[in-house]
């Protein structure tokens, strides 16, 4: 464990950020899985509405630096292509 006050604070702040980032990343992945499940079931209307929610979560994660912007764009593009293929 760190002895210096600033190092102790960094440990605490990093832990809080890690937990927050983990929650947001998990929520994003869950939304993506819901879209993919709807696509597998050939449920176009549901997939489109779920895609909007997933897109929002992906953009939020990219905006907060949890994932890279290019990775976010790639994920949204691949989901959109799957939906358009229905």
Curated annotation (Swiss-Prot):
GO annotation terms (biological process): translation
One cellular component (GO) term of this entry: small ribosomal subunit
Stored Pfam families: Ribosomal_S20p (PF01649)
Entry keywords, A to Z: Ribonucleoprotein, Ribosomal protein, RNA-binding, rRNA-binding
Top-level taxon in the UniProt lineage: Bacteria
GO MF term list: small ribosomal subunit rRNA binding; structural constituent of ribosome
Function: Binds directly to 16S ribosomal RNA.
Sequence similarity: Belongs to the bacterial ribosomal protein bS20 family.
UniProt-recorded name of the protein: Small ribosomal subunit protein bS20
Source organism (scientific name): Oceanobacillus iheyensis (strain DSM 14371 / CIP 107618 / JCM 11309 / KCTC 3954 / HTE831)
Chain's gene name: rpsT
